[in-house]
Amino acid sequence: MSDSIYAPHNKHKLEAARAADAAADDAATVSALVEPTDSTAQASHAAEQTIDAHQQAGDVEPERCHPHLTRPLLYLSGVDATMTDKELAGLVFDQVLPVRLKIDRTVGEGQTASGTVEFQTLDKAEKAYATVRPPIQLRINQDASIREPHPSAKPRLVKQLPPTSDDAFVYDLFRPFGPLRRAQCLLTNPAGIHTGFKGMAVLEFYSEQDAQRAESEMHCSEVGGKSISVAIDTATRKVSAAAAEFRPSAAAFVPAGSMSPSAPSFDPYPAGSRSVSTGSAASIYATSGAAPTHDTRNGAQKGARVPLQYSSQASTYVDPCNLFIKNLDPNMESNDLFDTFKRFGHIVSARVMRDDNGKSREFGFVSFTTPDEAQQALQAMDNAKLGTKKIIVRLHEPKTMRQEKLAARYNAANADNSDMSSNSPPTEARKADKRQSRSYFKAGVPSDASGLVDEEQLRSLSTVVRNELLSGEFTRRIPKVSSVTEAQLDDVVGELLSLKLADAVEALNNPISLIQRISDAREQLAQKSASTLTAPSPAPLSAEHPAMLGIQAQRSVSSASSTGEGGASVKERERLLKAVISVTESGAPVEDITDMIASLPKKDRALALFNPEFLKQKVDEAKDILDITDESGEDLSPPRASSGSAPVPLSVQTPASAIFKDASNGQSSISPGAAEAYTLSTLAALPAAEIVRLANSQSSSGLPLPKADPATVKATDDFIDSLQGKAAHDQKQKLGDQLFKKIRTFGVKGAPKLTIHLLDSEDLRALAHLMNSYEDVLKEKVQHKVAAGLNK
């Protein structure tokens, strides 16, 4: 065990320290000299001036002794065994020199060293106890099983401190009001994101009376040219409260309701150096003279994570590096848990879980670097007495796996009962089990600090766990953004799980992408369903009336390239008729509408039966065509087949490339007469392509439309042209990102659904022109969709 003294360049203090050390240990030697930084000296001078002013005014009573610290010696733990005494003194104890360090570094690889640190005076020991931060741990009691004294006062938040402030400055400023358990500058916001020093600090007095006096006297005082504020800290500071629970160089692990850590950890030691960035002057690790060292731990800790392993004993997947500890003493804190388990290896994190009121939930988690360390701790500590209780230690089973195991047991019991009382088909039972299982599925996917799904964390999981998490997340989100029924939910989720991980993450982070992926999944399922339908031989039908193609011209991009197939069978037509009746008002020409929908390609017919939104869209289009027929006096509907025969299909299709045709060059067979007067509302009821055609016609002067800016028109056309050759989904995705933002500015609910409906029912180029050049018409069209309930 090494024994070294470190002191500043101060001759009389150094001689006094040497004399004291000689009396205690003749073998003590002086190995290094460390000076306080200039900024620290300036801050300390400002604190002394403030304290002197209050003392002269009679505001501050003489300093009282620490209620628990009786000698200038503290027990030290959490020291990197590769760190020298000189580095430890310069980085951690530079504000309280001289110190005598006795560190036992004869520990296993990856384990931390411990020992004692002795100070010249009791005041310096008290200051170090209140200001030293993790991973270094200071204790008054040598026995780690004895709980450290806990302050009874509520924490105080200090704001508007000078930018040169550090922990030592804050301590010196407030110590005259009473003994402090903690005096540290805040380097993170309440959400746990590292922000650096922003002029705030947190104080913990042992006595509430001392805290109230400090708040009363120091609030609005001038410190370093700034007026500070002092008040009770009411914020829940995840990182600050848990700072002592995490090693700064380790990745955070918080197995709570969500698998994402509540506070990302950061490494205050950049590669090759033990000091933090010079911009973080508030950190106690900031020093101008720290020598760089080689940190052998970082490389191992930042490597690949250990995947979940299957435990035959538990019949589930477990995390081999993480321990679940229950039946904890209610008074046990995270520091106590860390100190208890640190002898078994390198601890990544140790946390006692608490409720919203800060009360212990009597269980916690300890995460080790390797499975061997965790296994050793499990064998040694299971059923061991810790505090007043015997603890139970188990390998951590992720919440997802635990709930799925319970669901499997529950469903197995239900299956046994149903076998005796029901003769339902096995496939239906399996689907029911699958849905029931999801009722237990509450775990969330890993997310980053901004709340977005973290692709890298998902990628680090095993395929089984990753798919389970994605399945649960899709199951929760799909009903919120789409009209997928309970019967369809499992199949749609199954299709989404077949996506690439990057595409799945994009869908979860982007509601527009999610709705589009759901639409694609339903279409793919409809194709599979349609392949099982039996269709009669197709019969030709000449397209004498181009207006008949109107129902095809409004088709989704994804279905625009379908080829003509056989018409609907009698049984299928009956299903279509029932579906049409369910979405039309009383008195509507349901037979004619059904005939027109029955003439669609097999793929679209199946989609109409499967997707209520798609069916309603096609019904509306069919009604528009029938209305035009009534006005012209011509019968443009396909001939209805006699009973027992199938309707005759259309043989002419709209090519997919037509969506990129400039709407200004196209001619609409359903356009109203040129002499007709338009209002904004009647214009919005027209297809986007027709609106753009009218806006570009010679008679556009009478329309309630502004003149389009040529530069905007060209930019829009260039954007649409850039999408040519891309997949239909990508085309909609690119335009949808812009359209969604525009619709959201209208202040309507259900913007994602409205966006998808417009993308599926309108010509993309024309829709882009409405968005960029005719915003008023687009807004009116959106209001029409809202009135029709298409945003629900």
From Swiss-Prot:
This is RNA-binding protein RRM4. PANTHER family: RNA BINDING PROTEIN. GO terms for cellular component: cytoplasmic stress granule; cytoskeleton; cytosol; endosome; nucleus; ribonucleoprotein complex. InterPro entries: Nucleotide-bd_a/b_plait_sf (IPR012677), PABP-dom (IPR036053), PABP_HYD_C (IPR002004), RBD_domain_sf (IPR035979), RRM_dom (IPR000504). It is found in: Cytoplasm, Cytoskeleton; Endosome. Part of large ribonucleoprotein complexes (mRNPs) containing RNA-binding proteins RRM4 and PAB1, endosome-binding protein UPA1, core scaffold protein UPA2 and associated factor GRP1. Interacts (via PABC domain) with UPA1 (via PAM2 domain). Residues 37-60, 412-438, 630-649 are annotated as: Disordered. Keywords: Cytoplasm, Cytoskeleton, Endosome, mRNA transport, Repeat, RNA-binding, Transport. Disulfide bonds: none annotated. GO terms for biological process: mRNA transport. Its main location: cytoplasm. Residues 72-145, 154-235, 321-398 form the RRM domain. It comes from Mycosarcoma maydis (Corn smut fungus). Key RNA-binding protein involved in the formation of polar-growing hyphae which is essential for infection by the plant pathogen. During filamentation, assembles into particles that shuttle bidirectionally along microtubules to both poles. The RRM4 transport particles are part of the endosomal mRNP transport that regulates polarity of the infectious hyphae by transporting distinct mRNAs encoding, for example, the ubiquitin fusion protein UBI1, the small G protein RHO3, or the septin CDC3, from the nucleus to cell poles. Residues 715-792 form the PABC domain. GO terms for molecular function: mRNA 3'-UTR binding; poly(A) binding; poly(U) RNA binding. Belongs to the polyadenylate-binding protein type-1 family. Gene3D superfamilies: 3.30.70.330, c-terminal domain of poly(a) binding protein. The RRM1, RRM3 and PABC domains are important for RNA_binding and polar growth. RRM3 recognizes the specific binding motif UAUG of cargo mRNAs. Changing F740A: Leads to a reduction of RNA-binding. Disruption phenotype: Reduces filamentous growth and virulence. Disturbs polar growth of filaments. It comes from the Eukaryota. Residues 640-649 have a biased composition (Polar residues). Residues 412-424 have a biased composition (Low complexity). The gene is RRM4.
